[in-house]
Each structure stands twice: as C-alpha cells, then as structure tokens.
Amino acid sequence: MISSITKENLINFKRPKFELKIRDIKDIKGDFVLTEEAKKRLQKIKNFFDSRIPVLLEGPTGTSKTKTIQVLCHVFKKKLIRFHLSSETNIGDLIGRVVSGGEDSWSSFRFVPGPFTEAFSKGYVLLLEEVNLGQNSVLQCMETSLDTGEINQDVPRYGIIKAKMHPDFIIVATQNPKIEGFTNQRGELSQKFLSRFTVVEFPTVEIDELRIIAKGIAEKNNYKMDDIVRKISDFHYQWIYKEEDSKSTKRGFTLRDINATIKAISNGEAPSDAVICFYGSRYKGKEFNHLLEILKTKYEGLYKNLNLIPKLPYDFPKCYSNYSLKKTFYFANIAKRHDRHLLIVGKEGSGVTQVAKWLSWYFTPEKKRKENFLFIVSPETTVSDMFGKFTPKGDASNFSSGITEWRNGPLTLTIKNGYSGVFDNISYAPAKVIESLNALLDPKDTEEDYYFEIPQNTVEPRVKIHKDFLFVATCSLSQMEKLSPAFLNRFTVINLEDQLEGATEKEEKEAIRHIIESG
C-alpha cells in the first residue's frame, strides 16, 4: 500500500514541462555525459521530484545512479545529503543521537540531528545509498515518518525528538542487485517499503551509449584522438561483458575506469600504460596474458610489452628487487599520478603488507614520512577507530561532567594533513566502516568534492581533504569477494605476484639477506 503522502502526490501528479538541455549541465565536471538514455532518466526523476514522489534507483554498480541525483541537485540548486546504509546502520545514525557538549563544554549533552532528520525537517534531498543493506528496524522507522509526516522518536538520555516534514523534502534510494557477489549481505526490501517508491531502472550501459560517454569524457578533457577513445570504450565493453573466463574477477569495473583512463591519457599518460594499469593491474599469469593478447591483436595502440618495465627508483626503500615488485610499483606509480587510491592484493604470505608500506612511504612527501602508520583492520574495527571520537579532556573523570575533546583517528589525520598510511586487511572491516569510506574515496572533480563529512565530530564535522591524501589498503585474494563492487571500483587494484617465482638460487639468497637486514 502506498503511503498517504505518496497517494496524494500521485493524485495530483502532473508532468511538468521540463526538458533538461546540454547547457543545463555544461559546468558539471567528471564522467557524466548527457546521452539520450541519461536525459530520459533525468527528466523522469525530475518530474517525480516536482511531485514529491519518493524514487528508488535500481541497477548495477557504476551506472551513474548517484551521479544522476548529484547533477539534478546541482542544476536545480537543491541541497543534497548522502548517506550509505549498511547492515550495521542503526536508527540513531539516521535520526540523530546525543553527544557530549564538545570541547570546553560544561553542558552535559546535546542532540545532533542525523541525515534523515535534517533533510526531513529542512526540505533537502536525502539520498540513501545501498538501501537494501539496511536493517528492517531502520527502514520501518523511516516508513512511519513517511506515513505520518513527522518524526516522533525517543532518544536515550534526551527524550522525545519531534520534527515535521518540510514540504520540499525529497527522498531517493539506490540499490544494487544481489548477483554481484557481495557475500549475500544485500537483503530483499519488503513490499511495504517498496510501495512508497517509484522505481527508475539504470540498466547496464550498452556499447553504443558507452562510445558516446567515452567521447563525451574525452571532449571534457580536451582529448581529440577519437580512434583511441573508441578503442578504449570497445575494449572496456569486451573485457567486462564478452570474455567468458573468470567474470567474477571483473567485479568493480565501471564508467569510473573509462573516465580515469581517458583523463590520464589527456594528461600525458601513454594510452597503453593507462589501459594496462587501470584494467590489467589486478590480474596475473594466464588472465593477465589473455588481457595483453586481446590488446595486442584487436586494439592497436593500447598494447605494451611489460618485459620492459623499468627498475625501481633509486630512492625506493632498500629491498630485494624482482619483476613482481617492479610491476607492482609500475602500476602504483601510474595510479598515484592520477589520484587513484591503491588496493594491494595477493596470496597469504606474499608480502602485500610490506610492499604496501613501502609504497605508502615512497608516495608520501619527504617531510611527512615520519607520520606514516600501519592500521590493522579487524572485524571489531569501528568508524570511531578510523575517524576519531570524543574522549575525556585531561582526566578520565571529566567525561561524566561533559568536559571532553575530539581526538582525530588515523584516517582523519591522513585526510587533513596529507599523510599516507596502510589499512591492512581491509576486507575484515565491518560493513558500516566500508560504507563510510565510499564518499571519501570518490574521484574529486570539483572543489566541493575535496570536503568530507564526519558527522560524529560535532566540533568540526566538515574536513578538507589534503591534496596529498592517499589511501593504501591490503587484502588477501581469498577475501576479495567480501568487498562490495561499489568499494572496489574506487581503487586501482594491484595483484602482487610471487616475488620468488622463477628466481635463481643466488636471487633467493639475496632475498633472504634483505629480509634479515630489514628486521
């Protein structure tokens, strides 16, 4: 049954005379291109917005669901609040919670509205990402507010919170299909919840539209080699959708990869280097050679002989130099040049943690290298462990009196100061931690993108992302299936191969000597 507010909207629904034109999005940066299909979806969603009908965007990762809403809000000057749901999201995360008064405060506690309450009461657009990861109790709480037109929630240590729904409030949700292999964490939304939304499908982008998108991205980046751009789009489509072997490893490839590739070559990167890095770095052995063979035989100009990989730079940490390590550095260096974050993967015992530490150290500006750190992620890791929390100021007894101060976590220090660090075993992070990272790791196309919200920090909830910020993570190959495609596609994934494969006895002894000397 459709909620009362939606029923009223449907009764009064009249399609506004709205037609989005190219000039409306001329200042939108990034990978959004106004194809005919994108235009139809934008017009449809805008019409639902005008009638205040909740919208559910449904489709695979990387089909521009989020970007579509960002474009609409930008064009029509609507404030947008994004929130990623997870299996650990609770009602307090959405409605709000009581926090200590903050630094030097003697007022014990205060209520800080959550994203749902803020958007609901102020008439903003609320975008709920990955809504089918949310708990039923959280979804039911939102259902009640949509039904009644008000929030009436009991908040521990504070009392009843009440808020009326603003007439301009708009709610949008996204969901990705379960078939993407994200270890069954996606649930089925109830019919009762679904009935409140009008579904807009975002299908897989077909080859003709993909070519238009690639050409549009090239034009935005003033890259005029149409033949190369077409080859990139055709290869992207063939590799992801037409190759039969190991399709599970192709999870995570999206339009972001086309955007990153074209942007890199427009900034001077050789097309072969960009394509092999952004599409091939996660593979090894047979799969990697298969990718190279496709490029060599079908896409002239995108192939490169990787037997000619250069040596490690002279200022790289002292180590046993080998083909696997040189190849990993080669990919990491290209990715870093184009502001891509790094996920180093490999078999257990392959040295991914040590190599990630070396890369993190090398890519950190020299004056900041002493601040590098290793953060070992576990199933018990919390968002507060990563970003920070309020702690008693000075004496622990001050907590009960409200005298507290915010202490940044390692990730916040990295974000603000441009340090680099390694987040080891990232696949062990709880879903709530992973979902909190997605917006942080998004490509940065505008000045506004360089700000990140840390709602737990009521003293400084908005942090500027330093230009030197680099997120380096590790994961074992056997654990990659635990990471969502939405998370994977924010990284250049680099597969560290066996560093002693094919080594001579002399080379093995050299490797052992380096291990002993490094402690």
Summary of predicted features, one role per range:
Residues M1-K247, G252, A264, E269, ...:
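AAA+ P-loop NTPase catalytic core and its hallmark functional loops
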